[in-house]
A protein has these predicted regions:
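Helix-loop junctions and short alpha-helical segments
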Residues: 86-167, 172
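Residue-level detector of well-ordered alpha-helical segments, enriched
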Residues: 86-94, 185-189, 212
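A mid-sequence, solvent-exposed acidic-amphipathic segment
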Residues: 165-194, 198-199
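Alpha-helical oligomerization segments
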Residues: 188, 199-282
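Generic structural signal for hydrophobic core residues of well-folded globular domains
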Residues: 98, 102, 190, 194-197, ...
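Non-transmembrane, amphipathic alpha-helical segments
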Residues: 83, 113, 156, 175-178, ...
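Short amphipathic alpha-helical segments and their helix-coil junctions
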Residues: 64-80, 162-179, 231-241
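Charged interaction/catalytic cores of defense and host-pathogen modules
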Residues: 1-123
Length: 282
């Protein structure tokens, strides 16, 4: 019989409902002395510039399905989470909401007053997301998104303009699964940014250059390649693919675009090293 040590026995599958209720209990009931994180978020919610037409944190939570109810523990009033969080998508939505509330609503100087609670919440969320291969990403305009980990995407995001970096990371957001229109817009952004360096890419990696721009120009990204009335652009093979097959090809284009950027980055790195070597010899 196999023996498992203490840390191996601690490993367990993520129960999204349990994790949600555990995090909510910290937010709703743990105090820094006088107030809870829930109190602080509710007090400052109207200052949040991204709140759209929501007037309170309670309204937002209930709209998203994360309801709470008041309970009595002896003479003490406490709050209990009553929302249903069974799926990974719902759990990710909850995590995005909480992280945006903590770091978007609570002023930085006030966050220090709730450091113990914030650290507890963030460590739980970070750990749970790690188990499902996701992480928290902050966009240039201050939004916090939960996206799937992609080493190539992260590497490219570090070397391109902030706006393009956000788009590259957002491509892996769970809400974009099945959203060809949004994926198409991101692919076009990637292609338009690569276009000025196309000739350079061709000398570095002709195969990637040829394949990437072939797909961009014939798979309904830059042009309408599904319109049979325009024979100059019509791609019958692509047009007849299923919706899912088209998305799979879009994902291939995305990965090819990342490889293009990484190929160019490697050339830049090699030039930098060569320049350093040359100066050293002199």
């Amino acid at each position: 019989m196999a023996r498992y040590n203490f840390f191996e026995r601690m490993e367990r599958e993520i129960n999204f409902q349990f994790e949600y209720e555990k995090i909510e209990n910290i937010i709703l009931n743990e105090k820094n002395g006088y107030c809870t994180l829930e109190d602080e978020i509710s007090e400052n919610f109207r200052r949040w510039r991204l709140r759209k037409n929501f007037d309170s944190f309670l309204e937002l939570k209930e709209y998203l399905g994360f309801k709470t109810e008041k309970i009595l523990k002896g003479y003490t009033v406490a709050w209990k989470a009553t929302g249903e969080v069974k799926s990974v998508d719902t759990f990710i939505l909850y995590c995005e909401m909480i992280i945006n509330m903590i770091f978007g609503v609570i002023e930085p100087d006030l966050q220090s007053h709730y450091r113990k609670c914030i650290n507890a919440v963030q460590s739980l969320i970070d750990y749970d997301l790690e188990q499902i291969n996701h992480y928290i990403y902050r966009t240039e305009d201050g939004k916090y998104l939960v996206v799937q980990k992609d080493a190539a995407a992260s590497a490219v995001a570090d070397i391109v303009a902030p706006e393009l970096a956000d788009a590259i990371i957002e491509y892996n957001h769970h809400l974009l699964k099945g959203d060809l229109k949004s994926k198409k817009l991101i692919l076009k952004q990637i292609a338009d940014a690569l276009e000025p360096r196309r000739a350079e890419l061709k000398t570095v990696n002709k195969t990637i250059e040829n394949d990437f721009f072939y797909m961009i120009n014939t798979m309904n990204v830059r042009h309408n390649n599904c319109d049979v009335s325009d024979p100059s652009k019509y791609n019958e093979k692509f047009a007849n693919l299923t919706y899912r097959e088209k998305e799979e090809w879009y994902d291939e284009i995305y990965q090819e675009g990342l490889m293009a950027y990484l190929s160019l980055e490697q050339v830049d790195r090699e030039k930098k090293i060569l320049d350093f070597k040359t100066k050293q010899k002199k």
